[in-house]
């Protein structure tokens, strides 16, 4: 039986489309390779996804006592979380709505 190690974070202050760009980099990679990709990627979303990946690795180390060299990223699920709505005043008494979108990330690791 294979154990799937996962970590989930909701409410990340980045849009799901930006998180998905970074998630595409690490899908199917070894954990050490994925950490290197995220370390040298110059995006804010890479920092956020990297924290979730480190949490999944910490879960593997603490709960399952797994060798970290044998882990790889099985799947990275990116979804949308809540949306904050703000109002921006415009000309002639009108107003526009500003949508500040938040994302959620689930990372699942598997042993090779």
From Swiss-Prot:
Q: Which GO terms describe its biological process?
A: translation
Q: Keyword check for RNA-binding, yes or no.
A: yes
Q: Name one GO cellular component term.
A: cytosolic large ribosomal subunit
Q: Which Gene3D superfamilies match?
A: Ribosomal protein L22/L17 (3.90.470.10)
> What Gene Ontology terms describe what this protein does at the molecular function level?
rRNA binding; structural constituent of ribosome
Q: Which UniProt key words apply to this protein?
A: Ribonucleoprotein, Ribosomal protein, RNA-binding, rRNA-binding
Pfam families the record matches: Ribosomal_L22
Summarize subunit and interaction data from the UniProt record for this chain.
Part of the 50S ribosomal subunit.
Record's function text: This protein binds specifically to 23S rRNA; its binding is stimulated by other ribosomal proteins, e.g. L4, L17, and L20. It is important during the early stages of 50S assembly. It makes multiple contacts with different domains of the 23S rRNA in the assembled 50S subunit and ribosome.
Q: Which NCBIfam families match?
A: rplV_bact
Q: Which PANTHER family match?
A: CHLOROPLAST 50S RIBOSOMAL PROTEIN L22-RELATED (PTHR13501), LARGE RIBOSOMAL SUBUNIT PROTEIN UL22M (PTHR13501:SF8)
Q: Which family does it belong to?
A: Belongs to the universal ribosomal protein uL22 family.
Q: Which named protein is this?
A: Large ribosomal subunit protein uL22
Recorded source organism is: Anaplasma marginale (strain Florida)
Q: State the taxonomy lineage.
A: Bacteria, Pseudomonadati, Pseudomonadota, Alphaproteobacteria, Rickettsiales
Gene name of this polypeptide:
rplV
